[in-house]
UniProtKB/Swiss-Prot annotation:
Species for this entry: Mus musculus (Mouse)
Subcellular location: Endoplasmic reticulum membrane; Cell membrane
Keyword Transmembrane: yes
Main location group: endoplasmic reticulum
Tissue: Highly expressed in the liver. Also found in the testis.
Biased composition, class Basic and acidic residues, residue ranges: 265-276
Annotated region (Disordered), positions in chain: 1-33, 212-294, 506-530
Comment block on domains: GRAM domain binds phosphatidylserine in the PM and mediates protein recruitment to endoplasmic reticulum-plasma membrane contact sites (EPCS) in response to excess cholesterol in the PM.
Function, in words: Cholesterol transporter that mediates non-vesicular transport of cholesterol from the plasma membrane (PM) to the endoplasmic reticulum (ER). Contains unique domains for binding cholesterol and the PM, thereby serving as a molecular bridge for the transfer of cholesterol from the PM to the ER. Plays a crucial role in cholesterol homeostasis and has the unique ability to localize to the PM based on the level of membrane cholesterol.
PROSITE patterns, sorted: VAST
Compositional bias (Basic residues): 507-516
Protein name (Swiss-Prot/TrEMBL): Protein Aster-C
Biased composition (Polar residues): 240-250
Gene3D superfamilies given in the database record: Pleckstrin-homology domain (PH domain)/Phosphotyrosine-binding domain (PTB)
Amino acid sequence: MEGALTARQIVNEGDSSLATELQEEPEESPGPVVDENIVSAKKQGQSTHNWSGDWSFWISSSTYKDRNEEYRQQFTHLPDSEKLIADYACALQKDILVQGRLYLSEKWLCFYSNIFRWETTISIALKNITFMTKEKTARLIPNAIQIITEGEKFFFTSFGARDRSYLIIFRLWQNVLLDKSLTRQEFWQLLQQNYGTELGLNAEEMEHLLSVEENVQPRSPGRSSVDDAGERDEKFSKAVSFTQESVSRASETEPLDGNSPKRGLGKEDSQSERNVRKSPSLASEKRISRAPSKSLDLNKNEYLSLDKSSTSDSVDEENIPEKDLQGRLYINRVFHISAERMFELLFTSSHFMQRFANSRNIIDVVSTPWTVESGGNQLRTMTYTIVLSNPLTGKYTAATEKQTLYKESREAQFYLVDSEVLTHDVPYHDYFYTLNRYCIVRSAKQRCRLRVSTDLKYRKQPWGLIKSLIEKNSWSSLESYFKKLESDLLMEESVLSQSIEDAGKHSSLRRRRRTLNRTAEPVPKLSSQRSSTDLGFEAKVDVTGKRKTVDSYDTALIVVMSIFLLLLVLLNVTLFLKLSKIEHATQSFYQLHLQGEKSLNLVSDRFSRTENIQKNKDQAHRLKGVLQDSIVMLEQLKSSLIMLQKTFDLLNKNKSGVAVES
């Protein structure tokens, strides 16, 4: 079994506040008493459901609304407080595969199938799950999840995105085991991660919904905190058999999905407790060191605790106009890099951005210096060419990036930059553009938090098929872009940390060694403080090398295509010759067949003529015999008539003689 995760994996070993959090859990809301593990299969009948739940919001997305109504109608025994968070098309493996749909809410995992009016309904309380694992269908296809409770095993397969589905189910399961309740903000973040822009909410609606204070749900009657703690310890003790190796294996499989950093599956500690509101003044010098009781970390980001020496230098994130875009949150991480250094890395012509551009096949980068606008914001424009690998588009596309540094930013403390990117040579480029928001917040002297959110903006509304094509390609490109950016920033962070450690080691040496090191120090400084002419020359060399590589690639591609076309021509000629031979053989065979038919006709004609002559002779012979017989009979008749005539003459003579005598 791959990627086995248990209930203890969500708890960090070094988290000293775990005991306090477990004692201060929000309690469950009272609801109807239902069986916590219901499995049924029945013939479908007439069922009606009265939609009268406590639904304090209205969603304009027909897709989510329809899914939620289906969920309510199919699982009427669940409490009204359970709202649909995600649904997945999958199949339940029993004696046969039962194709259906898996519904996930905050505390329940439900499956429903209807095949030829035969219903299969499964309801599993998340708190009853002992452990869950990623599995392979037929030990080959990695698209299955196995859910194990105390008495049963459920094997769900045919997931389209198994890793992403497993990650969300696992984290909600951990949330239930720790008696954590999702805040309204976390609920909406999960909803938007699973359903994306299909929710159709504008900025005002989102701000209003996120500003609603989450209701603390009371613990169900008749259940004490001691019982909860005992049940939670029992759950944990059942999962202790899994080692930390499974944790690392699961953490390695999570980034394969590419969706874990999206849409803020968990805000920072300071954000999860406060309401989203308008940006306050950035000139405030308020410094507060807080230790909030955080909810479950749904984004697997590190929330590093600051020591007392660095807390006084940090920026209070509550006083920062931080508002992510509605699209997706791709980066939310604390880097061991100062805020000023992070800004220089990302928004100047640094070696880091040059290396990053080369790795992303971005050439001909030209940028203007930062200029102050009339409103106080600073503006910078970049133009560059992107080498494309998509065969459906051209080889290159020109792009224009407009970067805006807002006036609320404070040097070395906080930077808020919006980047508007337009590509000019891709299909339907006049329909949309990309808006990226970079938020750099100082956390300590050599530490800052970087948040990058992005959204697709449309200049004119495309058709549904075109819109889905644009979003699919754009989101995949943005995801790979920011994954690479985060990876390079982590590498840069390790390099900077190593240089700081080396500097600390050098400072602790003897004075003689320190004197010798002074003479050796300017060498790396010279390499890091080269003139802009050297940088420009180096950039030109990189661009020239990139173009030579592209040209050589094009030449090789042309040669390969020419050879391929030549082979196709030779193949066509060979096929033509074979076809002509086959046609000639067919015609020859047809002519031979005609000649055979003609010869058969001649023989048959001769035979028929001979038969006719013989028949005519036989008929003539028979006719001659008949005529001869007729002549004989006529002769006999003639003789008979002559005799009769003679008899009559004799009688007449006798009568005349008698008359004379008398």
